[in-house]
Amino acid sequence: MSSVAACRRRRDVYRLFTGRSSEYWVGRFMPNASNLDITRRMGQFKSDLMGINFVAQIAFAYGSYTQSNRLIDNATALLEDIPAEDNRYIKAWNSVDAIARNAYESQALLQLSTEYCIKGRCEECPLTALLKRHGV
């Protein structure tokens, strides 16, 4: 848990998920492998997804539970360090010039999409209220 909670940067998550496979796993899934000291690396894309959807969530939840501002700040800093996601929801926001600069912002746009846009709750959306206040 301490390794997960300590992640503040994208590279910390990448390092967390880089490790050596034990003899058991190498021998079990790679029976013809001659070198049992094989390092397995998760790619950067999957590492980023783990940072967004696992590491930051666990750190934030545990920080909230234990009232640790340090853990909450670590989770926030991590999301700010990871690039924005690139999925259909974020592409839709990009098409109207709501560009997410990092995962923190893309998660906010994703939340708006799933809670308001998809459910047809446009009039309840905080963004709609903001646009109306500014006469847009």
At which residue positions do the language-model features occur?
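Hydrophobic, aromatic-lined core segments that form the binding pocket/scaffold
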Residues: 1-107
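Acidic, carboxylate-rich catalytic segments that either coordinate divalent cations
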Residues: 98-136
